[in-house]
Amino acid sequence: MAANPEDFSGWLEGNVAAARRHRGAEEEEGEAAEQGRTIKAQQAGHQPVAMEMTSTDSTNIFHLHDRESKDHDDGLSYTYLSSDKHYISHPDSTYFTGISKKETESLDKKEFSGAGPHSPKEIPTFDSRGLFSSDSGIEMTPAEWSDVNRSLADPIEEEKLEACKYIDIRRSPDMKSQQVVDAGFGANRSNTISQAAPTEQQTYDSVTMSWQKDHYNGNISEYLPYMEEPREDFGLYHSPTSKEPKSAPVTITFTGMETALQTEYPGNQQGKSNKGLRPSPDLVPTVTVSEPEEDSPESLTPPSTDADGYAEPCGSEKQREYGICEDELISAIKAKEGTKRFSSETNDEKQSRSFHAEKQDFTVMSTEATSASHYTKASSAESGDSEIELVSEDQVGAEEAMQSAYMTFSHISGPPPSPASPSIQYSILREEREAELDSELIIESCDGSSASEESPKRDPDSPMMKPMIMDIIEEENLSRTESFEASDFESCSLKEKKLNMENLAESASYLKGKFPAEIRADMPSTKKEEFLPQKKSPEGPAYQSKVIGMTSILGPKPLTFFKKKAIDLLYWRDVKQTGIVFGSILLMLFSLTLFSVVSVIAYLALAALSATISFRIYKSVLQAVQKTDEGHPFKSYLDIEISLSQEQIQKYTGCFQLYTNSIAKELRRLFLVQDLVDSLKFAVLMWLLTYVGALFNGLTLLIMAVVSMFSLPVVYDKYQAQIDQYLGLVRTNMNIIVTKIQAKIPGTKQKE
């Protein structure tokens, strides 16, 4: 059947016109989509990304394939994403937060290149603000944190928040390019970085990406274990399906770098579609990221890692490989703990929804590793369960940090919380410790403060009388500026010094070097009774030093009791009691002058027995006459338990040991002439005692000492001013004489 030429010509012209109209409509759609992307990129503060189609012949520049694979790739094209503009980060941002931005503009259905109506969806956008770290960290975060209120205001959009993703990337021991295979790729493939198939209940909320570059050769030494997969009804990539995976190489290069590394990952290859951009096994998608300026502002360092570069996940991330970090989410996000992940959706649900790649705008920023990064001083406060983590970096820490890379995906609901002031924590701990010490000192010195009128008294204006518990800031300033004299340090006991040292040690161990603090470990507290007394005791400084030395052995209670009794007796506060004691001692001593020691002991024992037996017979006769039964006359004294506990014996033995050791050391020092002047003084004293011994015996000297003990304190208390004046004159003359002697004796001029 012959066709009419005119009809065929008309039909051909109609088809050509229809094809031109269709092509014009597609060009208008492309221009509208490109204009929409440019407007949205400008609104979000992103740089536009150009999409180019180029041949794989140029891949040899980037070392993508070897010579064998290059022969099979001739003539093929791939998608090339590039950005020829450097994104200048905001220098005033130090904390980075992000949340998915909502689409506010109504776009034409033609822009979506998909069938069916499409409501505005949350399109994940990325914004980098000050993401330049000294340790070569690269972070990608969504836009300003102020968008949180807008995103969470809609309860429907609240249901779309998705779990955080955390991927830990290790460094190869040989520091070379290597292929990294994700062990759990088949089961956890839906948790990859480029999942771009959000549903009505789930969508990506925010993404934080951090990379690290090789510290030694300037190359990327870490690879991202993920694969982006093509989809029939979707432009670029979509969630994985159950189809058989195939290999598709992915290359990430940095402009300005001499070489680039490549890593191949398994991926799913589906049937081709004429809608959108999609890679095939023959296409090689390449992402080129521009290097920022060297004077980029510093950023937060990545989370603290251990020696092998492992970053500790937070929250429920410890329970599974890709968990949900809910520490920084507000209450609305916490309610979504049971939200299903992308992997739980069926293939039908994934294929029934379409995501439009024309509405995505990504900005990838990377930091440049230079020698100046070694001097970084930035630190990060890793938020999570209110835990403060301050990281101080040094040369070694920077080199160890270069051995690892990491990638984190997290929801951030707002600005990170500011870390608590370390000085306040230290002040609270110090205040509690000093309050405990002060309470113990008050209890121990309570009895000694009311023992007698001559007890040491503190000046009310003295710094030690001020309350130990004060305002935190005032106490911190006082602890760093207050100073003590040497005499105050000498009067402190060893026990208090030990307690104060433990206090400072606990404070230092709690902070772990997180902040510099001026710790003064030589500022112990002092007990009340250990201050130098305002009024001298009758026995002078030597007696005071002995009493203070007995404090750590006998304890406060025995010392206080005996000290009170001795003061009452020596100052004749109770005349009757003092008279009985003084008379008994003198009687015994005078008896020793007339009789031997054995005779004196025997006579004293017979006298005591005569008195007690006589009193016992007298009471018995009296009870028989009066026909009463009062019992034993000494029953009350017999009921008193007279025994020394083990603790008391140890205390008295310790006191005796202290005096014995002191005397032995002093005699050794004098007889072995450790100090020539002191040895000469001791020799003069012994020479004078020879004359005293010729005139008086030991008992006479002992009687004179007892009389002096019970008389001199009263006389000194009454005529203290005059006695001090004469004692000062005597001391001055003695010092002059000793100085003259030292000047004449060789070898003694160096002594003070």
Swiss-Prot record:
Main location: endoplasmic reticulum
GO biological process: brain development; endoplasmic reticulum tubular network formation; neuron differentiation
Region annotated Disordered, chain positions: 1-57, 264-319, 334-424, 444-465
Compositionally biased residues, Basic and acidic residues: 334-361
Superkingdom: Eukaryota
The UniProt record lists the keyword Nucleus: yes
Positions with biased composition (Polar residues): 264-273, 363-383
Record-linked Gene3D superfamilies: 1.20.5.2480
GO cellular component: endoplasmic reticulum membrane; neuron projection; nucleus; postsynaptic density
Membrane disposition: Multi-pass membrane protein
Residue ranges of every copy of the Reticulon domain listed in the record: 566-752
TM helices/strands, residue ranges: 580-600, 684-704
Upregulating conditions: Isoform A is repressed by thyroid hormone.
PROSITE patterns: RETICULON (PS50845)
Tissue: Isoform A and isoform C are both expressed in the animal hemisphere (presumptive neural ectoderm) of blastula and gastrula stage embryos, and along the anterior neural border, in the panplacodal primordium, and in the dorsolateral side of archenteron roof of late neurula embryos. At the tailbud stage, expression of the isoforms begin to differ. Isoform A localizes to the cranial placodes including the trigeminal placode, lateral line placode, olfactory placode and otic vesicle.
Location of the protein in the cell: Endoplasmic reticulum membrane; Nucleus
Keyword vocabulary terms for this entry: Endoplasmic reticulum, Membrane, Nucleus, Transmembrane, Transmembrane helix
Biological role stated in the UniProt entry: Inhibits amyloid precursor protein processing, probably by blocking BACE1 activity.
Name used for this protein in its record: Reticulon-1-B
